[in-house]
């Protein structure tokens, strides 16, 4: 009985020790967690205070680079040449030798018209030629006899002259017959319709078996020359002088075609021609550029964005466009000094596009300027420089001039 009581007592004591240990461990862990949270909150408060006193900003460094000067506009792709194929002779269409949408070369057979009537006409005029040729030969023989008789005074000079005239008439008639033969052969040739230019054929306008008329009454198909291919676009009249100067300085003025969203370069070509007058309703002038189109990336009536390079500014000091600020006094930037304090610096800008701006006056190479976080800045404010997120730095400042197209404009303010 005593042994059983001792066992119960021992078990109770062990359980009490375990409970007490767990209780003290839990309190220690709770106190430690609260301490860490308070420490983190205190650290965050210090960081917030630091950002309040020294606001976080992103900066970029002014650098020297070559800046291309582009002019841009919206253009429409058009075929270099467009031909509506028609028949030059009338007749029944007996065959088509093309598939809709295929490419053809100049001289390829497109269609055939029933040639029998033209073959008959050719045979007819050839027969007439043979008949008149025989008559001419007989008249020439008579002329030889007349000449002999005239020497013997057997016939009058009038009779001889008459025979000479007859021979000449038949000679002229033979020439007319030859012309008729040539015309008949030509008409027979026209019964085989060939491609007048190389290009892409469109949808057929008439089916086999139908009667096709001569001239432009019944078109057969339309062929568009798409390699090379042209783009028609317009620029403001103020840009004419820059384009003409570029033409004078360069044999070929480079023109680039981009897609509708200015995301993908489609083709690069050259300026082909400039219109001779300004559209008074829009204040623009039309221009045409020509592109190689072997890959068929340009299609007639397609809308594209055009970039025309008129100049390149060498050794220019540039900064990101985001760093440029504007006030009633003009353009300025927030320049960062060696102590990471900012000062407002008035600048004069030159060439500017969507990515960067040329600084003509006010900054030097290596100067740091604030690009993001300018709202909280005042003269002499200390700053905390932070790096941009990866998503924000995907298109870096060093790549800004190469990433996507943008129109350029020149300012001096």
Swiss-Prot record:
Signal sequence coordinates: 1-25
Alphabetical keyword list: Cell inner membrane, Cell membrane, Membrane, Signal, Transport
Predominant cellular place of this UniProt entry's protein: membrane
UniProt GO molecular function: efflux transmembrane transporter activity
SUPFAM superfamilies in alphabetical order: HlyD-like secretion proteins
GO (cellular component) term, any one: plasma membrane
An individual GO BP term: response to toxic substance
InterPro entries per the UniProt record, alphabetical: CusB_D23, Multidrug-R_MdtA, RND_pump_MFP
Listed transmembrane segments: none
Chain intervals for the UniProt region annotation (Disordered): 394-413
Subcellular location(s) per record: Cell inner membrane
Topological type in the membrane: Peripheral membrane protein
UniProt similarity note: Belongs to the membrane fusion protein (MFP) (TC 8.A.1) family.
Self-association state and partner proteins as the record states: Part of a tripartite efflux system composed of MdtA, MdtB and MdtC.
Protein name: Multidrug resistance protein MdtA
The species this protein was found in: Xenorhabdus bovienii (strain SS-2004)
């Amino acid at each position: 009985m005593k042994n059983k009581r001792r066992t119960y007592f021992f078990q109770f004591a062990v359980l009490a020790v375990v409970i007490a240990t767990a209780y003290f461990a839990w309190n220690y862990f709770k106190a430690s967690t609260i301490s860490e949270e308070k420490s983190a909150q205190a650290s965050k408060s210090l960081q917030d205070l630091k950002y309040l006193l020294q606001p976080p900003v992103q900066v970029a460094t002014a650098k020297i680079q070559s800046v291309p000067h582009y002019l841009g506009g919206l253009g429409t792709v058009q075929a270099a040449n467009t031909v509506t194929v028609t028949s030059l002779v009338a007749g029944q269409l007996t065959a088509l030798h093309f598939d809709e949408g295929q490419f053809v070369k100049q001289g390829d057979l497109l269609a055939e018209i029933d040639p029998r009537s033209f073959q008959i006409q050719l045979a007819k005029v050839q027969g007439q030629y043979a008949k008149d040729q025989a008559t001419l030969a007989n008249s020439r023989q008579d002329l030889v006899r007349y000449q002999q008789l005239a020497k013997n005074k057997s016939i009058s000079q009038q009779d001889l002259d008459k025979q000479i005239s007859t021979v000449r008439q038949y000679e002229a008639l033979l020439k007319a017959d030859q012309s008729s033969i040539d015309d008949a052969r030509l008409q027979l040739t026209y019964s085989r319709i060939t491609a007048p230019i190389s290009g892409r054929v469109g949808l057929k306008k008439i089916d086999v078996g139908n009667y096709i008329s001569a001239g432009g009454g019944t078109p057969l198909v339309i062929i568009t020359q798409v390699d090379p291919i042209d783009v028609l676009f317009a620029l403001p009249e103020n840009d004419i002088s820059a384009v003409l100067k570029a033409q004078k300085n360069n044999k070929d003025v480079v023109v680039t075609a981009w897609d509708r969203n200015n995301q993908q370069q489609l083709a690069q070509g050259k300026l082909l021609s400039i219109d001779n007058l300004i559209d008074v309703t829009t204040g623009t002038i039309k221009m045409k550029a020509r592109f190689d189109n072997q890959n068929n990336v340009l299609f007639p009536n397609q809308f594209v964005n055009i970039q025309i390079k008129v100049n390149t500014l060498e050794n220019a000091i540039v900064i990101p466009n985001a760093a440029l600020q504007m006030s009633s006094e003009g353009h300025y930037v927030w320049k960062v000094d060696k102590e990471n304090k900012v000062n407002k610096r008035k600048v004069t800008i030159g060439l500017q596009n969507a990515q960067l701006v040329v600084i003509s006056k006010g900054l030097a190479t290596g100067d740091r300027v604030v690009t993001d976080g300018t709202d909280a800045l005042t003269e002499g404010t200390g700053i905390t420089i932070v790096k941009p997120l990866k998503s924000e730095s995907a298109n870096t400042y060093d790549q800004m001039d190469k990433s996507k197209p943008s129109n350029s404009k020149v300012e001096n303010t």
